[in-house]
A protein has these predicted regions:
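Surface-exposed amphipathic alpha-helical tracts and adjacent flexible/coil segments at the periphery
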Residues: 1-256
Length: 256
């Protein structure tokens, strides 16, 4: 064993003591902690609700997330129902350690885990970039993380046991921005750095464009100009956009 992955229920002080013990015993062990992303309401994510209700196992990566839905209280004897002040009684906010990442680094955590399953390329690109900057000691801003999918942010168990205010009160994302699909790349001209795009939804100059593909990853840039000096690209047209390297078949979005 070279690395241990610590439970998400551990506090900062408990992690500190574990690392002290490892060093004291001269154990050749690395420590990994979860620092960003969705938090399962069950202890260490060992939830069977999706399996029980829909025969889709969370422990096999197939969770339908029934915890994210609204619930009511119903009297079994006479059927009376009560709506709660916040009906999302099992939907926890996302963990975000950016504000105190330096503390985890200081106590000696070796590796950080960021949620990536079922997330799009832009989410992965934005979140990993911000945390990479933080690890390298560069200035970061929580607002950057608020741009992509999130359910609101919590410090989890790092400083205390989460209370009722650590649960969300709506379904879906609180992201400040959203991607809008606008077309596909049909060609890329490397010599001039222009992507030819088949337009499915209108977009215009000075909007931020995101192009995603299996090989291209996530490419985000400001539309500075179209190849033919137009101002707007309309549905059904094929237009050229000045772009970093992308590939045929990549999906094209603008950020709203």
């Amino acid at each position: 064993v070279r690395r241990i992955v610590l439970a998400r229920e551990l506090s900062l002080e408990q992690i500190k003591e574990i690392i002290k013990k490892i060093k004291k015993e001269r154990l050749n062990l690395e420590v990994e902690c979860f620092i960003h992303g969705a938090m399962c309401v069950s202890v260490s994510g060992r939830c069977f609700t999706s399996q029980f209700l829909f025969n889709r196992s969370a422990n096999r990566g197939d969770c339908l997330q029934p915890c994210r839905r609204e619930y009511i209280i119903r009297d079994k004897d006479e059927g009376y129902e009560l709506e709660l002040d916040n009906n999302f009684v099992m939907s926890a906010k996302d963990l975000c350690c950016l504000p105190f990442l330096d503390k985890l680094i200081k106590i000696g955590v070796n590796a950080f885990k960021i949620e990536g399953r079922n997330r799009d390329a832009r989410y992965v690109a934005v979140v990993t970039k911000i945390y990479r900057k933080a690890i390298d000691g560069e200035k970061t801003d929580l607002k950057e993380l608020e741009r992509v999918y999130n359910r609101g942010f919590s410090s989890g168990f790092y400083f205390s046991v989460p209370g009722s205010d650590e649960f969300v009160n709506l379904y879906g994302s609180l992201a400040k921005e959203k991607k809008v699909y606008v077309g596909k790349v049909v060609n890329y001209f490397s010599k001039v750095g222009v992507a030819e795009i088949k337009v499915d939804n209108n977009f215009k100059i000075n909007e931020r464009m995101v192009i995603e593909g299996e090989t291209s990853g996530c490419v985000e840039f400001l539309i500075s100009r179209f190849h033919d000096e137009r101002k707007t690209a309309n549905k059904g047209e094929v237009v050229g956009v000045k772009s970093p390297k992308v590939r045929k078949g990549d999906k094209v979005y603008v950020i709203k």
